[in-house]
Amino acid sequence: MRFAAVGFTCIDVYKNLNISYPTGNGIDLMFNLMDLVPELVPSVVTAIGDDAYGQSMLEACQKRKVDTGHVTIVPGGQTAVIEMLLNGRDRVHHRAEKGVMIPYQPTGEDMDFIRTQDYIHTDLSWNVTGLLKDMRSKGTKIYFDFSKRYRHEDVPTILKKYQLWYFFI
């Protein structure tokens, strides 16, 4: 099964603990699926900066044998970073620097690749809504992760048109 994490990826940074790690909902889901579904053929379609955090994302994916051929590396760009805090045992998103994800759009070649996947994961953390119809035009199934964005203006449109979605309330 071909599966791609498409769109927003980032590095979670816990400054007070001196810990950082590559993540994003699609990356997390993909890594977990890789542990559960041995036949999964994983890939990621996203953008990173040419900074240390971007290198960390690439290394984490390559270590897990994820196809990174559709990761756009933006020269001089800042990889998306989410500064995290711990409140007891709960993680709290403190501050987000979306960096290169703000203007990110997949290339034509990226879109061709996306349409060859059996499943993709994506979410509202980037400008994806207008691309969804094209992404599924050749049968790719979309796992759409709304997380806590159940009031986003695009929710009704997406719910009417796509197969798999997830809310975290």
What kind of feature is each model-predicted range?
Residues 13-14, 130:
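Glycine/Thr-rich phosphate-binding loops of Rossmann-like dinucleotide-binding domains
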Residues 1-6, 60-73, 85-169:
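Ribokinase/PfkB-type carbohydrate-kinase core domain
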Residues 2-3, 15-81, 88:
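Substrate-binding N-lobe of the ribokinase-like
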Residues 14-15, 122:
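Generic detector of contiguous secondary-structure segments
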Residues 7-12:
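Short polar catalytic/cofactor-binding loops
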